[in-house]
């Protein structure tokens, strides 16, 4: 028997110490052992195989939700495994490193089930510097139970069915064969057979003519490991040959009805002491369905479909420290896969204030800003609303802070959109106010490729004014304008946009330090109500000062009257911080002057609420292109 090129095989004599021997000494009394380095190599090659087939997995993603993101989710987890896994002193410790990385990087239903399988594998293996292939096979078989137990309602014909077949076949082969590549190949052939059966086990797969995407992802993982065993080539030199018939991946026409009971695919990772996985799973069932809970007593990776992600997180914040959270809009994902209005995707951040109806109708993709309060991270407009945040901050003098979307969050959405669109236009909050623009620009440069254009536009605005620019950009896309023409138009529109914010309480300005305590007391005593705007570069400045709400309204009226002497207002909106009545009063005044109602009235983001304070109302407008040179 010959060693593989990567020298992955070691042998040991039964009931003796572990040591290597030469090929000529091999006989039936010897069997295989695996080291920490070798098991890590297997997993890294398997991970690369999944990443290489991300697009195929997205294309066949039908169950449980036809959102076309299984490939992206699994690829994201595999990248985390590649980047964070480490070789340790024992095989068990190495597998724990892999499992921890998987829990951190897991995305989606399949990702979390896969992560729990890896957790089960790490917990089932013996803690030694090497293990036999029989011991590895036994641990793989036991790991399947962990995967099953993590799911609320296990369904056959999915990833778990293929995992079970892999574990069973590996056990059988390990007792009858001595060459590790032959053992893996035997088990892989049975895994392929189980994969093909998924096409008939689930009606939705049979109708679509595809195998289960998650099951295919696991099969690719095994195939990558097997390729390494048989060839031993480095990843850069590998030419991976698919062994599964291409007919399994015939293009499909999604026919999802969009009538799912729950809209948001909600995920998180919590850490703590004595976490009870079964208790989490039972409680989470009351918030939605598709519940998957993976992990151990130290950490838990959670997946659930729900309409109330804020309620889910309110419960989970009590169970441990929130390390990671992610919420996907399945309605939006289904729209992307089946009902794209254009091949140009439109993205903005959650500081842009827009009604959900416009966001849905215009297929606008939102990247949510992180809100930090008392060591807890919230997702703006998803896991917390402005009113709730202000109510919390009233309890003490701690003012919530915000954090721009991180590079990984941005990369995930742009990478996902690249699977379905030809180009992306991103409109960000003023880069003077946030690092969002710079983060998007850096990620866009990283993801640059010939057939996928990404343009990042600094709106130099925020809140309602940013919302108007996003709405206008969506209209340009709907008209069928080219990518470059749209970018040029929007950049010109930014100079014709304006926001005026009535700050009706100075409490948050005092808490933040923008106004000293002494000056704040004086300003509050005389009833000062400043009007804040953004200058030409997007920096916040004071536009005027009034001494009552009525006085502030009068100043806004005068501002609009002055503007309309030389300009025409194309459209305007009004946004507010928990002050619907105040917004309606201002709307009535503006309609009388401008001659038409606002295009919408809506609540602000939590970010704006923290800055402007309770009851703030903002008027934003966009002028027509017939603008004189006079400044406004």
Range-by-range predicted roles:
Residues 2-3, 7-9, 16-26:
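Short, positively charged and aromatic/hydrophobic N-terminal segments
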Residues 73-98, 383-418:
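Glycine-rich oxoanion-binding loops at beta->alpha junctions
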Residues 347-405, 409:
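N-terminal glycine-rich anion-binding loop in soluble enzyme alpha/beta folds
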Residues 30, 40, 44, 48, ...:
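Acidic, glycine-enriched active-site microenvironments
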Residues 145-149, 161-164, 168-299, 333, ...:
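Mixed-charge interfacial surface used for oligomerization/domain docking
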Residues 308-325:
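Charge-rich, low-aromatic oligomerization/scaffolding segments with amphipathic character
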Residues 108, 115-119, 426-448, 468-471:
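Short Gly/Thr/Asp-enriched flexible loops that form oxyanion-binding sites at enzyme active sites
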Residues 298-307:
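A generic structural motif
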